[in-house]
Curated annotation (Swiss-Prot):
MF (Gene Ontology): rRNA binding; structural constituent of ribosome
Residues covered by the S4 RNA-binding domain: 96-156
Any one cellular-component term (Gene Ontology): small ribosomal subunit
Signal peptide start-end: none
Subunit structure: Part of the 30S ribosomal subunit. Contacts protein S5. The interaction surface between S4 and S5 is involved in control of translational fidelity.
UniProt xrefs under NCBIfam families: PRK05327.1, rpsD_bact
Claim: Metal-binding is one of the keywords in the record: no
Keywords linked to the UniProt accession: Ribonucleoprotein, Ribosomal protein, RNA-binding, rRNA-binding
Domain of life: Bacteria
Name listed for the protein in its UniProt record: Small ribosomal subunit protein uS4
Length: 206
């Protein structure tokens, strides 16, 4: 399945919630009917079956993190293999992706922009360039903007924007140095309550 390149707002309207795919503290302003399906008049949303609800939740999370179907399924398999709660393990793996950490640290306004920074070799982990967005960041890893990329206006703008967002407690960021430390693995209580990972587990358990 190819990566979606169309309007970001359309995806948020499809899922009925703000997926934070656009730059800004909130991706969608008050004039946009987020609870209305895409289309000129907004298609009426049918009542979902259990399977439909599970599928929608999986699609929502996959789109939030910008992950293709096969890769998302592999994350689920890895989460299921690990000890503990499979759903929580899945979210922890997704949060540990380098592109997500770059976004969470405020170096990019969106995860898509963070993925681009990583792919363009603007990010270093423990002093070494890493250009793989799915790279798993470990506890105590230092993630920073590469020296020659620090003058990019979009990075500075993103850091200013990040000051308006709630700062993740599992990360420690030095905005002046443009670097941060992955202090600990996030707990479920640290992450979005708008995600129902149990529905995803039910979907893949069938």
């Amino acid at each position: 399945m190819a990566r979606y390149l169309g309007p970001k707002l359309k995806l948020s309207r499809r899922e009925g919630t703000d997926l934070f795919l656009k730059s800004g503290v909130r991706a969608i302003d008050s004039k946009c009917k987020i609870d209305t399906a895409p289309g000129q008049h907004g298609a009426r949303k049918p009542r979902l079956s259990d399977y439909g609800s599970q599928l929608r939740e999986k699609q929502k999370v996959r789109r939030i993190y910008g992950i293709l179907e096969r890769q998302f399924r592999n994350y689920y398999k890895e989460a299921n293999r690990l000890k503990g709660n499979t759903g929580e393990n899945l979210l922890v793996l997704l949060e540990g992706r380098l592109d997500n950490v770059v976004y969470r640290m405020g170096f990019a306004a969106t995860r898509a922009e963070a993925r681009q920074l990583v792919s363009h070799k603007a990010i270093v982990v423990n002093g070494r360039v890493v250009n793989i967005p799915s790279f798993q960041v470990s506890v105590n890893d230092v993630v920073a903007i590469r020296e020659k990329s620090k003058k990019q206006a979009r990075i500075k703008a993103s850091l200013e924007l990040a000051e308006q967002r709630e700062k993740p407690t599992w990360l420690e960021v030095d905005s002046a140095k443009m670097e941060g430390v992955f202090k600990r693995v996030p707990e479920r209580s640290d992450l979005s309550a708008d995600i129902n990972e149990h529905l995803i587990v039910e979907l893949y358990s069938k």
